[in-house]
Amino acid sequence: MSVAAKPVTVQYFYKIKWGFQEEFLALFDRNHWPLLKAQLESGRLLDVRAYEPRFHGDGRQDWTYEVTITYKDWAAMEDHTDPAIVRSLYPDAEKLAREEQRRMELLEAHWDTPLEEHALPR
């Protein structure tokens, strides 16, 4: 299997403004998750998992929501969501754009981290 054909895992970190966690999650679940789910079903994505910290941490909380996506390969990661999927799930493109803009407005920070697996000795 060539390097290009290997799965690629990326962590997407979100630091949500205090008091807006529920609104952010509602928008994510309504607008972003269905797009990810459709791409899981199509095979572009191999796995999607979402996490929240269980505890408040040690006083330094860099993120409040994290999504880990495993793409089938680098090409899948570099492609954008198929516009046909977006149109089929969200015929009201203006509403989707407004709600996605609002979701981003609720953030203090957002960053993506592509991961390189470190093989542990056996």
Which residues does each PLM region occupy?
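A cross-kingdom feature marking solvent-exposed beta-strand/loop segments within repeated
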Residues: 53-56
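A short glycine-rich, hydrophobically flanked beta-strand micro-motif that places a catalytic Asp/Glu
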Residues: 47-51
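Short, flexible turn/loop "capping" segments at secondary-structure junctions
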Residues: 2-8, 58-61
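Active-site-flanking beta-strand signature of metal-NTP-handling nucleotidyl enzymes
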Residues: 7-15, 66-67
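Short acidic-aromatic low-complexity motifs
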Residues: 16-20, 73
